[in-house]
């Protein structure tokens, strides 16, 4: 298993600089952010120009990685494939196909996305719509030797009341999406705050995991007693992502049992990339703090990996 990180935590830095830093600090892989330029939306970046991908861009990406002893674990473009606005949805699908094309040219690495949700429709209506939307995208990827994977992030900030905005947050929904030909980018942090045992959820499905995130979560029980499971209400409009009773952390600084998580991946036969997704507010806010957070994560995770 190799250790890498998702480059979205360094949105202002060019790929060449990120790759040089990663190689110099002992990382083995990068999961490259491949969003289009979408302003200051947090935890997105454009380190691969998927919408203008050509031979020169492929050479640039390969050169940055190869020159620093790094492999490419995946392309990351996580957006709402069930967006209620048809024009927005079409744009997301077009960019997702561009990411698939880029991934095919870069060796057939997986492409990460979300199911998403139309918040104005019921869950069952969204599932039926997804069953219409995703087969052409899965076929497009398969024809190019690329696996389309979905992260089990809740995306509660996409729903006005903090309900799940990405219908891939539980094992029940994973089984449904596997039937559509989708794969899983497993992240234990989301399950922890949902009250789902990450290890119990993972073990039956390791063979469907093509990429694994390393992100921790910290739950504050006393705050949950104040706000309830669904989080803040009267102040939600100030920050729809802040539920008030939990937060993401660097691996090892929250409550996920990472030794057992990595062991469960190994036991199930996973030998891919463990990719740190850095969204820790304590170790963020400046380039220096982000780097320090990644170094803490590496120190905590590297002893768990074989090779």
Predicted regions and their residues:
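N-terminal pre-domain/capping segments
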Residues: 1-109, 124, 131, 135, ...
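Acidic/histidine-rich catalytic cores of soluble enzymes
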Residues: 2, 125, 135-255, 305-306
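Conserved active-site loop/cleft motifs that coordinate metal ions or position small ligands
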Residues: 30, 268-279
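Active-site groove signature of glycoside hydrolases
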Residues: 103-123, 149-159
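Active-site beta-loop-alpha junctions enriched in small/polar residues
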Residues: 6-10, 33-37, 77-80, 116-118, ...
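Conserved beta-strand positions in the central sheet of alpha/beta enzyme cores
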Residues: 31, 74-76, 112, 149, ...
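A short, acidic, amphipathic alpha-helical segment used as a generic capping/interface helix at domain edges
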Residues: 253-267
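Alpha-helical scaffolding within the catalytic cores
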Residues: 56-61, 172, 198, 257-261
């Amino acid at each position: 298993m190799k250790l890498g990180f998702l480059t979205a935590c360094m949105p202002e830095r060019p790929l060449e600089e990120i790759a040089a830093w990663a190689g110099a600090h002992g990382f083995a892989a990068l999961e490259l952010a491949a969003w289009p330029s979408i302003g200051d939306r947090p935890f997105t970046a454009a380190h691969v120009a998927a919408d203008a991908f050509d031979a020169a861009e492929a050479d640039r990406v390969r050169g940055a990685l190869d020159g620093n002893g790094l492999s490419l674990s995946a392309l990351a473009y996580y957006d709402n494939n069930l967006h209620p606005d048809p024009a927005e949805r079409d744009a997301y699908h077009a960019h997702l196909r561009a990411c698939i094309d880029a991934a095919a040219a870069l060796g057939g690495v997986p492409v990460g996305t979300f199911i998403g949700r139309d918040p104005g429709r019921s869950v069952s209506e969204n599932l039926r719509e997804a069953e219409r939307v995703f087969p052409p995208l899965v076929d497009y990827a398969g024809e190019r030797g690329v696996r389309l994977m979905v992260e089990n992030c809740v995306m509660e900030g996409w729903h006005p009341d903090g309900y799940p905005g990405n219908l891939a947050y539980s094992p029940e929904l994973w089984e449904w999406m596997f039937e559509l030909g989708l794969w899983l980018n497993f992240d234990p942090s989301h399950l922890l705050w949902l009250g789902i045992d990450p290890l119990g959820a993972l073990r039956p499905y390791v063979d469907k995991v093509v990429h694994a995130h390393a992100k921790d979560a910290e739950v504050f029980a006393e705050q949950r007693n104040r706000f309830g499971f669904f989080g803040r209400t009267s102040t939600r409009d100030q920050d729809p992502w802040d539920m008030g009773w939990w937060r993401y952390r660097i691996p090892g600084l929250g409550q996920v049992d990472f030794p057992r998580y990595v062991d469960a991946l190994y036991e199930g036969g996973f030998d891919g990339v463990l990719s740190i997704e850095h969204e820790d507010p304590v170790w963020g806010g400046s380039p220096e703090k982000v780097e320090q957070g990644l170094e803490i994560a590496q120190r905590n995770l590297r002893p768990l990996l074989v090779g």
